């Protein structure tokens, strides 16, 4: 692991330890989840770009991304302008997110919602369910193979989908061993935060046809989307370019249509 990811993982362990003290697992697991929505089906339907639109205030590499940050309003705008799913950053320390943002976004949309965070403990999976997540993110670079399989199976037992994220061919091979169709290719290195959207095109050849590739990071223009579609990639996780836009709804529409 690298320094940025190590820092995030170290802090996340401390964060989870505090959460477990405040609300032990036996208490958390008794809370009833709300309505579940089908994340996978939402990405499959029709041929227009399947955009997972992200609610993200800041990042370690870019600092503050959106000053005027109204989670409820952003969720509504994404829903009204053609997003297939939402992604909500819930990491507090590094992304200025919050777990409550996920519950709030879910209450303002009819779309399935992904919890975007750094999962390092099964406690967070139960927490995700209670918050209203329909899908969780597992980052291959953060977990060993036993954790990946255990966490994937637990999430699916709890009726959530799993998006597994890789950045290298080795990580992709590990991701493909998991029983989930959602394969994320992060074009941004978590080692140095450099971005190259060609990575998704390069790694696509190793992904079986029955999987859904979601290209993540660096998708900023209609041309980027057309490039990916020309290589058979039709699902996109897009955050920063939308969050920086003055008119989020228009920006989303511009990405999806000529």
Curated annotation (Swiss-Prot):
<dbReference type="GO" id="GO:0004425">
    <property type="term" value="F:indole-3-glycerol-phosphate synthase activity"/>
</dbReference>
<comment type="similarity">
    <text>Belongs to the TrpC family.</text>
</comment>
<dbReference type="GO" id="GO:0000162">
    <property type="term" value="P:L-tryptophan biosynthetic process"/>
</dbReference>
<dbReference type="InterPro" id="IPR045186">
    <property type="entry name" value="Indole-3-glycerol_P_synth"/>
</dbReference>
<dbReference type="InterPro" id="IPR001468">
    <property type="entry name" value="Indole-3-GlycerolPSynthase_CS"/>
</dbReference>
<dbReference type="GO" id="GO:0004640">
    <property type="term" value="F:phosphoribosylanthranilate isomerase activity"/>
</dbReference>
<comment type="pathway">
    <text>Amino-acid biosynthesis; L-tryptophan biosynthesis; L-tryptophan from chorismate: step 4/5.</text>
</comment>
<keyword id="KW-0210">Decarboxylase</keyword>
<dbReference type="InterPro" id="IPR011060">
    <property type="entry name" value="RibuloseP-bd_barrel"/>
</dbReference>
<keyword id="KW-0057">Aromatic amino acid biosynthesis</keyword>
<keyword id="KW-0822">Tryptophan biosynthesis</keyword>
<protein>
    <recommendedName>
        <fullName>Indole-3-glycerol phosphate synthase</fullName>
        <ecNumber>4.1.1.48</ecNumber>
    </recommendedName>
</protein>
<keyword id="KW-0456">Lyase</keyword>
<dbReference type="InterPro" id="IPR013785">
    <property type="entry name" value="Aldolase_TIM"/>
</dbReference>
<keyword id="KW-0028">Amino-acid biosynthesis</keyword>
<dbReference type="InterPro" id="IPR013798">
    <property type="entry name" value="Indole-3-glycerol_P_synth_dom"/>
</dbReference>
<dbReference type="Pfam" id="PF00218">
    <property type="entry name" value="IGPS"/>
</dbReference>
């Amino acid at each position: 692991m690298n320094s940025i990811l190590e820092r995030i993982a170290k802090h996340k362990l401390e964060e989870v330890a505090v959460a477990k003290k405040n609300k032990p697992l036996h208490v958390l697991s008794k809370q009833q989840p709300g309505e579940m929505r089908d994340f996978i089906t939402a990405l499959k339907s029709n041929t227009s770009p399947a955009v997972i639109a992200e609610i993200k205030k800041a990042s370690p590499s870019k600092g503050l991304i959106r000053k005027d940050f109204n989670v409820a309003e952003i969720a509504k705008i994404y829903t009204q302008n053609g997003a297939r799913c939402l992604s909500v950053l819930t990491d507090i320390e590094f992304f200025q997110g919050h777990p409550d943002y996920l519950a709030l976004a879910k209450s303002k949309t009819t779309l399935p919602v992904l919890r975007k965070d750094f999962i390092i403990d099964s406690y967070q999976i139960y927490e995700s369910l209670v918050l209203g997540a329909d899908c969780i993110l597992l980052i291959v670079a953060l977990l060993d193979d036993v954790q990946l399989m255990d966490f994937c199976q637990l999430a699916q037992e709890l009726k959530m989908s799993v998006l597994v994220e890789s950045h290298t061919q080795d990580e992709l091979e590990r991701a493909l061993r998991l029983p989930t169709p959602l394969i994320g290719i992060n074009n941004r290195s978590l080692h140095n935060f450099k971005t190259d959207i060609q990575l998704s095109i390069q790694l696509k050849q190793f992904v079986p046809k029955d999987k859904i590739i979601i290209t993540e990071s660096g998708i900023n223009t209609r041309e980027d989307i057309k490039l990916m579609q020309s290589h058979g990639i039709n699902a996109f996780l897009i955050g920063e370019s939308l969050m920086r836009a003055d008119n989020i709804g228009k920006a989303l529409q511009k990405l999806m249509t000529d």
